[in-house]
Swiss-Prot record:
Similarity section: Belongs to the universal ribosomal protein uS19 family.
Task of the protein: Protein S19 forms a complex with S13 that binds strongly to the 16S ribosomal RNA.
Source organism per UniProt: Desulfitobacterium hafniense (strain DSM 10664 / DCB-2)
Domain of life: Bacteria
Protein name, UniProt field: Small ribosomal subunit protein uS19
Disulfide bonds: none
Assigned keywords, A-Z: Ribonucleoprotein, Ribosomal protein, RNA-binding, rRNA-binding
GO biological process, one term: translation
Keyword Cytoplasm found: no
Amino acid sequence: MSRSLKKGPYVEGRLLERVEKMNAANEKRVLKTWSRSSTIFPQMVGHTIAVHEGRKHIPIYITEDMVGHKLGEFAPTRTYKGHAGSEKSSGLR
């Protein structure tokens, strides 16, 4: 279910302030954030935002295709290392 239109998209206020300040100063640096639920706005395009995934921050370069998505979609929280192999299948044939 999507968010109500009268509320508008969610973005952490401090994150948007920092991005707009960087746009005004025309500087590019990595912004750290824990706000995985923030929506990506057009002002963020071209910036690198390090999104927390539970252990560390994963740097994500924002492109135009990402606008409208959430930051957390691009920083997976679970690692899949594959199913355990059975000893029976590893024997000689």
